Amino acid sequence: MARKIIFLLFLIPFSSWAIEMKLKEGERSATLKQMKNFWISADCKKCEAQNIMESSSPDKIKKALAEVPDGRIAPGTRVCNGLGGMSWALKDDKGRTQSICEFKDKSYVLTDDLAGLIPQN
């Protein structure tokens, strides 16, 4: 029994590393559903200053976006999305604030209710 416990304790660091590597490998092939989960569950404490996604309240996020001049986040501002993309915000033609996220070769728009991502061409 003691050997099994020691063996399992030995595997713990490798299992977290394996999960992290799997996430990195799956970035390009992640489905929209997975991206929603990544966005919602992102560890925003690791993000740099001016991170508007630290709050889980959609109203606070929308207010933060609205306070930025011209509806845009300053260049270099990082927004947590779990996939490591840089993000910024802008207002559409109807005056609604949306966040546009770039993931390497694809871009996605955060929906008005901040509940999901819509692929953009």
Provide a role label for each language-model segment:
Residues 17-121:
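Mitochondrial intermembrane space
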Residues 2-8:
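Sec-dependent signal peptide recognition
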Residues 13-15:
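N-terminal signal peptide c-region/cleavage motif recognized by signal peptidases
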